[in-house]
């Protein structure tokens, strides 16, 4: 009998599906974080494969800051309706009442209150003991050293010195009362593999990933797409149409576009093959001098 050899992408797919099923078998109340980006779309696709023909055995959670791109909100609602999964949307109402926003309070405070604290609120509100996320090790240095099962204490804090060994594909999911884990099924994927998989599996993604002429403001070296009227232009600033796309998506004032002509998936893949920069170069929160990604994770960030 001829032995079938899996391609590299098929091996990654099998590993991710194994992780998804393992967590559902081990944990009482899991949830999948849904940030609406390309990695979330791939993770959702893998989850639907993992539990086909049944429905997803967990809800999806979107932590809404109120500052996502309008196209992201449209895509989120359309996807939830098309696939019929349970979608939970949580917003930090206290932060919203305080008027917290990235322009007035800066990226660090905005992220801490509207994302980190909001996520912790949702974890406590629904009593989730495991949360899937689409982070990958190739994205950023603190994520590179994080385990697939990332253990958090009862305050949702991550201690990089207190991690469990993961030998081969064996994961220790034992937790104490009040503790939880963050699970990263895409840990071993790279950005180019994500795009190749999206192309091969014909996965729907937010149109912002494709190049198009968009209203752009250049500020502090970032190409900011003006998505609504909540921005005040500084002296000498102008908005002009530029051909851009996004490699990563987040709050629109904190997410920089890249100049590009890639309007199809093959074009994006070609562009990625010659790119020498990280996709997260366009995320303002990663450049906060006093609040690195590791510090955010120690405070409870995903």
Curated annotation (Swiss-Prot):
Q: Which InterPro entries match?
A: PAPS_reduct_dom (IPR002500), Rossmann-like_a/b/a_fold (IPR014729), SO4_adenylTrfase_ssu (IPR011784), Sulfate_adenylyltrnsfr_sub2 (IPR050128)
Catalysed reaction(s) here are: sulfate + ATP + H(+) = adenosine 5'-phosphosulfate + diphosphate
Asked if DNA-binding is a keyword of the record, the answer is no
Q: Which residues form the signal peptide?
A: none
Q: What is its EC number?
A: 2.7.7.4
Tree of life domain:
Bacteria
Q: What does this protein do?
A: With CysN forms the ATP sulfurylase (ATPS) that catalyzes the adenylation of sulfate producing adenosine 5'-phosphosulfate (APS) and diphosphate, the first enzymatic step in sulfur assimilation pathway. APS synthesis involves the formation of a high-energy phosphoric-sulfuric acid anhydride bond driven by GTP hydrolysis by CysN coupled to ATP hydrolysis by CysD.
* Family annotation (HAMAP family): Sulf_adenylyltr_sub2 (MF_00064)
Q: How does it assemble?
A: Heterodimer composed of CysD, the smaller subunit, and CysN.
User: What name is this protein filed under?
Assistant: Sulfate adenylyltransferase subunit 2
């Amino acid at each position: 009998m001829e032995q079938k050899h899996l391609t590299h992408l098929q091996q990654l797919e099998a590993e991710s599906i194994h992780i998804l099923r393992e967590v559902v078998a081990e944990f009482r109340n899991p949830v999948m974080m849904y940030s609406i980006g390309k990695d979330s779309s791939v993770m959702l696709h893998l989850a639907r494969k993992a539990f086909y023909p049944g429905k997803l055995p967990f809800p999806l959670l979107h932590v809404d800051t109120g500052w996502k791109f309008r196209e992201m909100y449209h895509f989120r609602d359309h996807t939830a309706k098309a696939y019929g999964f349970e979608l939970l949307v949580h917003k930090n109402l206290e932060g919203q009442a305080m008027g917290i926003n990235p322009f007035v309070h800066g990226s660090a405070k905005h992220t801490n209150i509207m994302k980190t604290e909001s996520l912790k609120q949702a974890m406590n509100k629904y009593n989730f003991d495991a949360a899937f996320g689409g982070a990958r090790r190739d994205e950023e240095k603190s994520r590179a050293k994080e385990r697939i099962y990332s253990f958090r204490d009862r305050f949702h804090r991550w201690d990089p010195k207190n991690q469990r060994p993961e030998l081969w594909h064996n994961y220790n999911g034992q937790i104490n009362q009040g503790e939880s884990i963050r699970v990263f099924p895409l840990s071993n994927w790279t950005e180019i593999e994500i795009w190749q998989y999206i192309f091969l599996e014909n996965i729907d993604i937010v149109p912002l990933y494709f190049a198009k002429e968009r209203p752009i403001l250049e500020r502090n070296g970032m190409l900011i797409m003006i998505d609504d009227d909540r921005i005040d232009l500084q002296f000498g600033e102008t908005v002009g149409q530029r051909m851009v796309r996004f490699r990563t998506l987040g709050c629109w004032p904190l997410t920089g576009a890249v100049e590009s002509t890639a309007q199809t998936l093959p074009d994006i893949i070609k562009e990625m093959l010659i790119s020498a920069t990280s996709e997260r170069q366009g995320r303002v929160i990663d450049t906060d001098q006093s609040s690195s990604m590791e510090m955010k994770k120690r405070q409870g960030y995903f």
